């Protein structure tokens, strides 16, 4: 027997023993087509952010961190993710460590309150134990922890005011994430942590900004999104919302450092049609002629969206089939079709080849 065949035989026996001891799938050949699957995602609820992620949303089986300053839209993005997971028939949980969830606002964003799992834990250990249990159950698709800054260790709560508790929260997060990271990949759940920005004292060079909870979350997170509040959105003299910018500062499933701009309306969440309209204009799918906007359908028909951007956006709200077609074309351009749609297209292609 040649050395090459002998090595192959020994390797096959070793792989077989590993699978017998630790279960099927505990070790695999990466190039095996049956093992390599497209990245499954839960949409973010924003087309612009879906594009920035590079895969069309939050990757399943991974940990995601959304961080930013106060009132920058972190919880809004998390609630939109819950609404999207529920639309797909999934189960979502909200760990309200801040004890600040507004059910009316969540409902306005499309969250089904009747099926939403919610917990308002007494301390950080309890919150993270609940997350771990939900992940290990294997039936929860999305878990949101709002927020890391509010995960106060039990020792700090039970201690007196002014007691020094150095690094307690960082150690808690490090220990919990070691447990959660291993099981989240097997369960195909998405765990989203929202986090706040703090200022480091005495920093002379570089950014003085940092996030709470130590370094563990930065390490274990597959995707980290920085959210910043931009200029206000006005209707006449009244401020009705804010432009927010999102930067993907870490991404293990696609190229990082992409940015997105979206629009949050107070009490309503992301203005999807306004966002869609702006992207369609940038991609030249919607054409401007003077002050009028036009869209040419896949059938070749030119449709007038209206005079001025506000009328064009209203047209998209009144005609969801046109808005849906534009969104599908944009997603197809960026390769963001869902796994189900891609598999359906492959099946249609193979059936066409067989017929021919």
Swiss-Prot record:
Keywords: ATP-binding, Cytoplasm, DNA damage, DNA recombination, DNA repair, DNA-binding, Nucleotide-binding, SOS response. Belongs to the RecA family. SUPFAM superfamilies: P-loop containing nucleoside triphosphate hydrolases, RecA protein, C-terminal domain. The lineage of its organism: Bacteria, Thermotogati, Thermotogota, Thermotogae, Thermotogales. ATP binds at residues 68-75. One of its GO terms (molecular function) is damaged DNA binding. Its main location: cytoplasm. It comes from Thermotoga petrophila (strain ATCC BAA-488 / DSM 13995 / JCM 10881 / RKU-1). NCBIfam families: tigrfam_recA (TIGR02012). GO terms for biological process: DNA recombination; DNA repair; SOS response. The keyword Transport does not apply. Pfam families: RecA (PF00154), RecA_C (PF21096). One of its GO terms (cellular component) is cytosol. Gene3D superfamilies: P-loop containing nucleotide triphosphate hydrolases. This is Protein RecA. Can catalyze the hydrolysis of ATP in the presence of single-stranded DNA, the ATP-dependent uptake of single-stranded DNA by duplex DNA, and the ATP-dependent hybridization of homologous single-stranded DNAs. It interacts with LexA causing its activation and leading to its autocatalytic cleavage. InterPro entries: AAA+_ATPase, DNA_recomb/repair_RecA, DNA_recomb/repair_RecA_CS, P-loop_NTPase, RecA-like_C, RecA-like_N, RecA_ATP-bd, RecA_C_sf. PANTHER family: MITOCHONDRIAL DNA REPAIR PROTEIN RECA HOMOLOG-RELATED, RECA.
